[in-house]
């Protein structure tokens, strides 16, 4: 038996053991875990330093190092996310609908756990805790497979979770970490249909595509963020400038950062110099501009076709000038990764049209796309941002990690 199969078996067994846990027990444990994370900050930072040192040795970019880095403040934020999950209403056992049918059968539809969730993710070690807390609150066991660059951090975090579970009298196998970073083991996890009920990949386009091609278990696709901001003809240009600067430069390595800028031709000649001057005072950006936008910049390079399809995760942004709202919507729908999109406008009708017709999980009017986040949306720590339409869409909180079951009660009923 392979190590992966042993992990799968333990997770499956654990899912049965934690299925009956009450809301009170789950919430008490999550509060305990939140405190343990803060108390054990120095141990977690020491493990993270090993990952950062390895990353530096291998020439990882500063932006990608930021994704990997833990700090005292970030650990505190992770702990706050766990506590927020504890404070959320428990969806398990929630009655979605109940009725008596024509035969007199009493039928209830309730929320139930999925069972065993597998998570394959890259770089960001906070995902280990975020994913576990949501899975545990919904009575699911979870198997975590992080990237090799965050292995020391993930091992320390999962060790802390398992120790906390054991101290609380709960099976530590509710969380499993795949420590082997090989692609063969990851592929085995993708095909573990005997043990895994759903697989959630969280990372770049290459990871998502690999999972889509190789997985045999059901997959919820997440994460890739080719995110656009459209500056409309009726935009407040000062507002647009502030929003673009925030969405591009605040944390360019995250999936809700803006990658593409679409500008109405009526304001392009005013807006582009204004934006370029303002953003250079914060953080210079490499502009990859189309033929109409290029001469309006002091410094830019001609965009290639692939630039409009790329999640840069860096201080780089594609720029497209359009002649109408309809062209902007068409362009965005052609190039979107269905994550988050935004329009800056004072035209209420244009805003409504944009929100109705743009095909994305989150569509903003006059706000930065950086808000697409489970914590910000009040869902607690998110397990990912789904870019598909089934079974979940957008930031995935507790309800996204549940299924439903029909409970039918009769009194000797038979069907003629």
Curated annotation (Swiss-Prot):
One of its GO terms (biological process) is L-proline biosynthetic process. Pathway: Amino-acid biosynthesis; L-proline biosynthesis; L-glutamate 5-semialdehyde from L-glutamate: step 2/2. Pfam families: Aldedh. It comes from Streptococcus pyogenes serotype M5 (strain Manfredo). Belongs to the gamma-glutamyl phosphate reductase family. GO terms for molecular function: glutamate-5-semialdehyde dehydrogenase activity; NADP binding. This is Gamma-glutamyl phosphate reductase. NCBIfam families: PRK00197.1, proA. Its main location: cytoplasm. Gene3D superfamilies: Aldehyde Dehydrogenase, Chain A, domain 1 (3.40.605.10), Aldehyde Dehydrogenase, Chain A, domain 2 (3.40.309.10). It is an enzyme of class 1 (oxidoreductase). It is found in: Cytoplasm. It catalyses: L-glutamate 5-semialdehyde + phosphate + NADP(+) = L-glutamyl 5-phosphate + NADPH + H(+). Keywords: Amino-acid biosynthesis, Cytoplasm, NADP, Oxidoreductase, Proline biosynthesis. The gene is proA. Its EC number is 1.2.1.41. GO terms for cellular component: cytoplasm. Catalyzes the NADPH-dependent reduction of L-glutamate 5-phosphate into L-glutamate 5-semialdehyde and phosphate. The product spontaneously undergoes cyclization to form 1-pyrroline-5-carboxylate. CDD domains: ALDH_F18-19_ProA-GPR.
